[in-house]
C-alpha cells in the first residue's frame, strides 16, 4: 500500500532549511554573478527548489520509477509502435569509449572508426530497403518524413515542375504523414480504403494528375494488412509523374522478405528506435534515416559519409543540389551505434526470423481474440492487427474502458481509436520478442475483460481500480495542461 508521503509531490515534501547535500568550503576567490552575466539573465529571487534530504529524493524518484511501464518490465502491445525488447549488448557497444567519448567537431582522421560504422550502416540500410543511398541525419520518423518530402519537392523543382504540390495519403495513414507534408509546404489529398482495408485503386487513379508530387504509403498499412496492389499503384503514380514515399513505421513486418525499393518506392524512412531496437520512449532520442533511389540521391542532406580510394572515410559536403542540413551535427550517433550493433548481431537470417516471428505472433493473437472481439478485416495480417470493440459498445462499454481495465492487470494498453476508419478500434502489435506464454497470458486477460463486459460491465466502466491514479479528466488535461508546480493559494 502506498502512503500519502509516497504520493506527495516533491515540492509538497519540502521543508525550509532541510539539506540534501553540503558543498565544500569555497577555495577560490568569490566572484559576483553580475560580473559574469548580463542583468536580464540573473534571477531577482532564488529559485523555489524543493528542500529535501538525499534519502527523500532517492525514495521519491525510485517510487516514481516503479510506476513507469516499459518493455523491460512488461508486455507492451502498442500498435504501430513496435515496442520490442532492446538487447543490452547494444548498450554495451554504444558505451565503448571510442564511440561514447567522440565529439562531432573532431578531425576526421581521429574518428575513422565512428565514420566507418556510419558508412557501413548507410550501406546496410540501403541493402535492407532496396535503396541506392542513405542519409543518417534525421532525428526521428517524422523528421525522416519531412526530409524525404523536401527531397521530392526539390526533385520536382529541379525539373521545372514546382506546380507538383499534392501528396496523396490513404485514410488509414499515420497522422504524421499529412503533418509532414504541410511542414514541407505541400498539400495533402486523402483517398479512401476499400472493403479489403487496402488502398482503393480507382480512387488512386482519380487522384493522380499533373499536380501530383508523391504518394505516401505504409506497407503493411496501419491495419496490419499488406498492400497487395503496390506494383500497380507504383505504376499509376510514376506514369503521372509522381514519386512513391515509403513510411517505414511498419518495416518490422518485411525484413528479409520484401524491400520497398523492389515494390517501386523512390524514398523510404526507417525508425531505428522501432525496427532496429534504438530504443525509444521517453521523448527520444530516436533516429529516422532516409534512403533514396538514384533520382533523388543528389538532394540528400549534407554531409554524408563517403569512402576514399585509400579506404579512409570522410564527410562529403560537396553536394550542390542538397537540401542542406536537417539536424545539428550529424544525427543521433548513439542510436545509430545501437542499430548497427543490432543488425550485425542478427545478420540476414536473424532479421528474416524477426519478421517471420512478428507476423506469426500477430496472427496467433488475432485468431484467438477474434472469438470475443469484432475483427473488421478477416484475413491474414502482418506484424499487427486491428480489432473493434463494437460488440462491447452495445453493452455500454467503450474501447477506452477496456484499455483502462488492462491497467489493473499490469499491461500497457494497445493503441486505441486509431486508425480512425475502424469504429472503437484496438490496434495490437505483439512484436517478435515475446514468448507464446506471454501472448497467452495477455489473450486470457482480454477474454476475461470481454466476459466482464457481458456479466459485470461496471467493473470495466469504472476501471482502473488498482493504479495510484484513477480516471483522469483527459480532455481538460490536454487542453489546459499544468506543466509546472503551482502551490495552492
Curated annotation (Swiss-Prot):
Picking any one GO biological process from the record gives: glycine decarboxylation via glycine cleavage system
The coenzyme or cofactor needed here is: pyridoxal 5'-phosphate
The reaction(s) this protein catalyses: N(6)-[(R)-lipoyl]-L-lysyl-[glycine-cleavage complex H protein] + glycine + H(+) = N(6)-[(R)-S(8)-aminomethyldihydrolipoyl]-L-lysyl-[glycine-cleavage complex H protein] + CO2
Single Gene Ontology MF annotation: pyridoxal phosphate binding
Coiled-coil region: none
Residues where N6-(pyridoxal phosphate)lysine occurs? 274
Q: What is its EC number?
A: 1.4.4.2
Functional note: The glycine cleavage system catalyzes the degradation of glycine. The P protein binds the alpha-amino group of glycine through its pyridoxal phosphate cofactor; CO(2) is released and the remaining methylamine moiety is then transferred to the lipoamide cofactor of the H protein.
Its quaternary structure?
The glycine cleavage system is composed of four proteins: P, T, L and H. In this organism, the P 'protein' is a heterodimer of two subunits.
Give the family, as the similarity comment puts it: Belongs to the GcvP family. C-terminal subunit subfamily.
Record-linked HAMAP family: GcvPB
The protein's name: Probable glycine dehydrogenase (decarboxylating) subunit 2
What's the source species for this entry? Brevibacillus brevis (strain 47 / JCM 6285 / NBRC 100599)
The UniProt gene name for this protein comes to gcvPB
Amino acid at each position: 500500500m502506498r502512503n500519502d508521503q509516497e504520493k506527495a509531490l516533491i515540492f509538497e515534501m519540502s521543508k525550509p532549511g532541510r539539506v540534501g547535500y553540503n558543498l565544500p568550503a569555497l577555495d577560490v576567490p568569490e566572484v559576483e554573478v553580475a560580473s559574469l552575466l548580463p542583468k536580464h539573465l540573473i534571477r531577482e529571487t532564488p529559485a523555489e527548489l524543493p528542500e529535501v534530504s538525499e534519502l527523500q529524493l532517492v525514495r521519491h524518484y525510485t517510487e516514481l520509477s516503479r510506476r513507469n511501464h516499459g518493455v523491460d518490465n512488461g508486455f507492451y502491445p502498442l500498435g504501430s509502435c513496435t515496442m520490442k525488447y532492446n538487447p543490452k549488448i547494444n548498450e554495451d557497444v554504444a558505451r565503448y569509449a571510442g564511440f561514447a567519448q567522440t565529439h562531432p567537431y573532431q578531425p576526421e582522421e581521429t574518428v575513422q572508426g565512428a565514420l566507418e560504422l556510419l558508412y557501413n550502416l548507410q550501406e546496410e540500410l540501403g541493402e535492407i530497403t532496396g535503396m541506392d543511398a542513405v542519409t543518417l541525419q534525421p532525428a526521428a520518423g517524422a523528421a525522416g518524413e519531412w526530409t524525404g518530402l523536401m527531397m521530392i519537392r526539390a526533385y520536382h523543382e529541379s525539373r521545372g515542375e514546382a506546380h507538383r504540390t499534392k501528396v496523396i495519403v490513404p485514410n488509414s495513414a499515420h497522422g504524421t504523414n499529412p503533418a509532414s507534408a504541410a511542414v514541407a509546404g505541400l498539400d495533402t489529398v486523402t483517398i479512401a480504403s476499400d472493403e479489403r482495408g487496402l488502398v482503393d485503386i480507382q480512387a488512386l487513379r482519380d487522384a493522380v494528375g499533373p499536380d501530383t508530387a508523391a504518394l505516401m504509403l505504409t506497407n503493411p498499412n496501419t491495419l496490419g494488412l499488406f498492400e497487395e496492389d503496390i506494383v500497380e499503384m507504383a505504376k499509376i503514380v510514376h506514369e503521372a509523374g509522381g514519386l512513391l514515399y515509403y513510411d517505414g513505421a511498419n518495416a518490422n513486418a518485411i525484413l528479409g522478405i520484401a524491400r520497398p525499393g523492389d515494390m517501386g518506392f523512390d524514398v523510404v524512412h526507417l525508425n531505428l528506435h522501432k525496427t532496429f531496437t534504438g530504443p525509444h520512449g521517453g521523448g527520444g532520442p530516436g533516429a529516422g534515416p532516409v534512403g533514396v533511389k538514384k533520382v533523388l540521391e543528389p538532394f540528400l542532406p549534407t554531409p554524408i559519409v563517403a569512402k576514399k580510394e585509400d579506404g579512409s572515410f570522410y564527410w562529403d559536403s560537396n553536394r550542390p543540389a542538397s537540401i542542406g542540413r536537417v539536424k545539428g551535427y550529424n544525427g543521433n550517433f548513439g542510436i545509430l551505434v545501437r542499430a548497427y550493433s543490432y543488425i550485425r548481431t542478427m545478420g540476414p537470417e536473424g532479421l528474416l526470423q524477426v519478421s517471420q516471428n512478428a507476423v506469426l505472433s500477430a496472427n496467433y493473437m488475432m485468431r484467438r481474440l477474434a472469438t470475443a472481439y469484432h475483427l473488421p478485416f478477416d484475413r491474414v495480417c502482418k506484424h499487427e492487427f486491428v480489432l473493434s470493440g463494437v460488440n462491447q459498445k452495445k453493452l455500454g462499454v467503450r474501447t477506452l474502458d477496456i484499455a483502462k481495465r488492462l491497467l489493473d492487470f499490469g499491461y500497457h494498453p494497445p493503441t486505441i481509436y486509431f486508425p480512425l476508419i475502424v469504429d472503437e478500434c484496438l490496434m495490437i502489435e505483439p512484436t517478435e520478442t515475446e514468448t507464446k506464454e506471454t501472448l497467452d497470458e495477455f489473450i486470457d486477460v482480454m477474454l476475461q475483460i470481454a466476459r466482464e463486459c457481458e456479466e459485470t460491465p461496471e467493473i470495466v466502466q469504472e476501471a482502473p481500480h488498482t493504479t495510484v491514479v484513477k480516471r483522469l479528466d483527459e480532455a481538460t488535461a490536454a487542453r489546459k495542461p499544468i506543466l509546472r508546480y503551482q502551490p495552492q493559494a
